[in-house]
A protein has these predicted regions:
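Conserved beta-strand hairpin/beta-sheet module of binuclear metal-dependent hydrolase folds
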Residues: 4-61, 67, 93, 110, ...
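Metallo-beta-lactamase
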Residues: 38, 45-48, 136-149, 165, ...
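Active-site HxH/HxHxD metal-binding segment of metal-dependent hydrolases
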Residues: 25, 45-52, 57-164
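C-terminal regulatory/interaction regions
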Residues: 260-321
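Short, leucine-enriched amphipathic alpha-helices that occur as contiguous helical runs
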Residues: 42, 93, 254, 258-262, ...
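Short Gly/Pro-enriched turn/cap motifs at secondary-structure boundaries
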Residues: 5, 20-21, 146-148, 153-155, ...
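Aromatic/hydrophobic pocket-lining residues that form the small-molecule binding cavity
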Residues: 54, 217, 221, 295
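Histidine-centered divalent metal-coordination motifs
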Residues: 74-80, 98, 179, 183, ...
Length: 321
């Protein structure tokens, strides 16, 4: 099956849509031609599928990698920048990314920190679950799903709060953490167009405390809402014509999870892993990642808001206040 689902040209913003909205499909890629060649916002995933996705998409628009001069990365995750290795085989563009994701773009091992893998391993060890994730390798996990990560040669910090001119588009850089510490969205005010990255789409992106957590995610949605965008193009999925409604839906889904946890605690005290299993009643790997990070993000907010508390002890249970 082709990794490309379709294409769209929005007044010079050329979109390459991935075959599906769910990971490990690559992110949508945005291409903006100009008199010097072209710029890209995100480049897609590593692995052979990611390579085909990128090259086939550019071929559709009659473009070649050698003419790429600028890459803006919404964040340093493998489905958004894994294909940078294929780019660097042909050309060495200027690469812009938020300062908080620069380290991960240059040395992907830092993703184990922002994905909160150590947190997940700690909670898993305390819980005594039979599945052993003590040797979990995040990058093998990426490779196994065909969504490999790769490193940039050099990057520049993108000017948060300022504008970046890409062809005929003037994008305001909006810092929108939650899913990644340096996640950005790009807003063209004249067109009312918001490139929302992973934060708005069919469902919420995963989130961990180190990436901004639930608190950061909700604040990012507030920031997006204040822009009063008309149209959103997410990193995963198709064009969204009612931007405000899409943002409200994601916020509602996030808060529904919080309410679900609160109601679970009304039935009695529960451990961290019991709450994680309530949120994600699927396979153990989802309990481990991203389940632990998501659960921790909710509990941090709920403790801050004074609606739950944790009992004493290493494996203390959570209770409602």
């Amino acid at each position: 099956m082709s990794p490309v689902d379709g294409f769209a040209d929005l007044n010079g913003l050329k979109v390459i849509f991935a075959a599906g909205p769910l990971w490990p499909n690559p992110a949508n890629v945005f291409v903006i031609p100009d008199e010097r060649g072209f710029s890209m916002i995100d480049v897609g995933s590593g692995g052979e599928t990611g390579r085909d996705y990128l090259l086939n998409g550019l071929k559709h628009w009659g473009l070649q990698l050698r003419d790429l001069h600028t890459v803006v990365l919404s964040h340093a995750h493998p489905d958004h920048m894994g294909a940078i290795r294929y780019v660097l085989e042909e050309v060495h563009p200027r690469v812009l990314i938020h300062r908080l994701d620069m380290a991960s773009a240059l040395e992907p091992l830092h993703l184990t920190e922002t994905f909160d893998i150590a947190l997940a391993k700690d909670y898993w060890a305390i819980s005594g679950r039979k599945e052993d994730y003590s040797n979990f390798d995040l990058f093998q996990f990426f490779d196994d799903f065909g969504c490999s990560m790769s490193a940039a040669e050099s990057v520049e910090a993108i000017p948060e709060g300022e504008k970046v001119q890409l062809g005929g588009f003037s994008f305001e850089i909006v810092h929108t953490p939650g899913h990644s510490p340096g996640h950005i969205s790009l807003f063209d005010r004249e067109r009312g167009l918001l490139l929302a990255g992973d934060l708005v789409g069919n469902s919420p992106a995963w989130y961990t405390p180190t990436s901004g957590g639930l608190i950061g995610y909700l604040e990012s949605l507030d920031r997006m809402e204040s822009l009063e965008a008309q149209t959103i193009i997410p990193a995963h999925g198709g064009i969204i014509e009612d931007a405000a409604n899409a943002i409200r839906k994601i916020r509602s889904k996030l808060l529904k999870r919080e309410n679900f946890l609160y109601n679970a605690l009304r039935e009695g005290p529960k451990t961290f892993m019991e709450l994680t299993e309530h949120l994600f009643p699927q396979s153990p790997i989802l309990h481990f990642f991203p389940g632990c990070g998501i659960t921790a993000s909710h509990l941090i907010k709920m403790e801050r808001d004074g609606i739950i508390q944790r009992e004493e002890g290493q494996n203390g249970k959570y209770i409602n206040c």
